[in-house]
Amino acid sequence: EDAFVGPSLGAEAINQGYLSMALGLLLVIVFMIGYYGTPGWMANLALFFNVFFIAGVLVQIQAALTLPGIAGIVLTLGMAVDANVLINERIREELHKGKGLLDAINIGYEKALSAILDGNITTVLIGVILIIFGSGSVKGFGVTLCIGLVTSVFTSVYISHILIDWMAKRQIKAG
């Protein structure tokens, strides 16, 4: 039995995908701020940089965003949030051990790095396999997944570190 999805149903599915991504992002923002406070704000800012970088790369390669592409972006944003949770929990552990704020931040990032890289590298490998052996929408999912993972690692490990360091130095300077 063949099924045909017309253009209006496809457009509706894409719009629902955008809506679910926006709603999910809003819930993540609320959680990160509510649970982590100021570091949650910094993680959210890094997440917005991530979305900006993903969109920029997709525009540069002239990729059409499909439902599987949206799913790939949502998955990578989830992994970016996970990376920020790992980092923030490591920082908390170091603060509970009595480390100073800047030391706790640097050690927290250092300790979280291997777990973040392991998870993202293995998922990029899966994305590459999907790109090589997949066709159509599977390949599109793999492309957005790989792009999103690269930008997620960059924003989670580098951009958020800069932002949290900046926030900590302002906090220390303010007394």
For every predicted segment, state its role.
Residues 56-57, 93-175:
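Hydrophobic alpha-helical transmembrane segments of membrane transport and translocation systems
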Residues 1-22, 171, 175:
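Structural signature of multi-pass, alpha-helical inner-membrane proteins
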Residues 9, 32-36, 57-68, 73, ...:
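Hydrophobic alpha-helical bundle architecture
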